[in-house]
């Protein structure tokens, strides 16, 4: 099973994970939580700068600042069968700054944000403490399968 990823680079990054790395992270996350593990999905991962992230965050969340990842699940109209999950928007500048401030390996933080965003696309959230603990637990499990340490431990 390989989900179709439309990778859009809308900024000038210094170094990116490979398309295969993005693919592995998405496939592993969705295999862990999908009710139809053999079903393929399509999603867009758009890599943006602070300006675009801030504009989208203000427009859709009324927060006038850039953020690390935004998730826009696709809502399929009744009676139509489409395997579109939605869009992930990852702000490279915020992601890099977080990794540095939290003493995290950049590659591991990339993986975490992609997985975190995928969980949002399939309906997970972290508004309440209970939801946050459930989502974090799933993220930790997925990351462990990829050989990546728990991102919630103090570094």
UniProtKB/Swiss-Prot annotation:
Keywords: Cytoplasm, Endonuclease, Hydrolase, Metal-binding, Nuclease, Ribosome biogenesis, rRNA processing, Zinc. It is an enzyme of class 3 (hydrolase). Its main location: cytoplasm. Pfam families: YbeY. GO terms for cellular component: cytoplasm. Binds 1 zinc ion. Its EC number is 3.1.-.-. GO terms for molecular function: metalloendopeptidase activity; RNA endonuclease activity; zinc ion binding. Zn(2+) binds at residues 116, 120, 126. One of its GO terms (biological process) is rRNA processing. Gene3D superfamilies: Metalloproteases ('zincins'), catalytic domain. InterPro entries: MetalPrtase_cat_dom_sf_prd (IPR023091), YbeY (IPR002036), YbeY_CS (IPR020549). It comes from the Bacteria. Its cofactor is Zn(2+). The keyword DNA damage does not apply. It is found in: Cytoplasm. Single strand-specific metallo-endoribonuclease involved in late-stage 70S ribosome quality control and in maturation of the 3' terminus of the 16S rRNA. HAMAP family: Endoribonucl_YbeY. Belongs to the endoribonuclease YbeY family. This is Endoribonuclease YbeY. It comes from Colwellia psychrerythraea (strain 34H / ATCC BAA-681). The gene is ybeY.
């Amino acid at each position: 099973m390989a989900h179709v990823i439309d990778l859009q680079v809308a900024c000038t990054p210094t170094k990116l994970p490979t398309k295969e790395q993005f693919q592995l992270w998405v496939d592993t996350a969705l295999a862990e939580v999908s009710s139809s593990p053999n079903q393929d999905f399509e999603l867009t991962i758009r890599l943006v700068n602070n300006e675009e992230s801030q504009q989208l965050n203000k427009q859709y969340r009324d927060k006038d600042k850039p953020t690390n990842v935004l998730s826009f699940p696709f809502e399929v109209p009744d009676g139509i069968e489409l395997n579109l999950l939605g869009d992930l928007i990852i702000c490279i500048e915020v992601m890099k700054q977080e990794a540095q401030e939290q003493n995290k390996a950049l590659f591991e933080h990339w993986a975490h944000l992609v997985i975190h965003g995928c969980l949002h696309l399939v309906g997970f959230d972290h508004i309440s403490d209970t939801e946050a603990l459930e989502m974090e637990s799933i993220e930790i499990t997925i990351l462990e399968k990829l050989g990546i340490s728990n991102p919630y431990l103090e570094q």
